[in-house]
């Protein structure tokens, strides 16, 4: 297991992805596991993240924050020579977070990242990027990000049925600069989030919000109402074109919650998720 003594440099890795990534073709995922021990949380950075995602400023890490800590390890793995797909162009389909207990800002963390479960998708191939956080050798947080690499799929995806959105419990104005602001705190500087001109090169009429920002913003609305241990699943749907006016709806489902984010004017869905107690 390769052990990292410092956080990978995202600027260098994204440059590597641009220069070498588009020619990648492969059929197998690497079995590499990257580990970075003795990671401390920068309180200033945490406060900036909290403000961008609208979490309260506390000594407890937001449930989505460890994803930001592990993201450089994910990018390092996805830009390694043995990774079969280009980093640029990968689509974030879904994200699951399993929180075994809350994490505090003063705890020393070990980050661990690997990839698994390569499988077919109607539009190509999908795989799961697994991120783990351990404290004193004990797992306390797991994130599963499912990515799609388009091309070569069966094309047999079911047509989406038109579903009327629920009545919103809140309406949020999403500023046009949220992509740049989240990029600054997350390190995810994909050009589709930063500027309309760059987004148009990839087929979007305007810059779009990061999927993990939309998930974080939704979970910030639940602060103070969730148990210590829970699993939160999200499927990303249509992108949030910036600036935007979004509707948020939440309702109780069994012992947990269901929630949705959608365009407040058209009802077009952006995200659907569930929170289930326990881990």
Regions found by a protein language model. Give the residues of each.
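Hydrophobic beta-strand-centered segment that forms part of the acyl-chain substrate-binding groove
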Residues: 61-115, 125, 214-249, 256
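Hydrophobic residues on conserved beta-strands that form the core of alpha/beta folds
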Residues: 34-36, 142, 229-231
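HotDog/MaoC-like acyl-thioester-processing domains
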Residues: 1-29, 73-75, 93-174, 242, ...
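Hot-dog-fold acyl-thioester-processing enzymes
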Residues: 1-94, 154-225
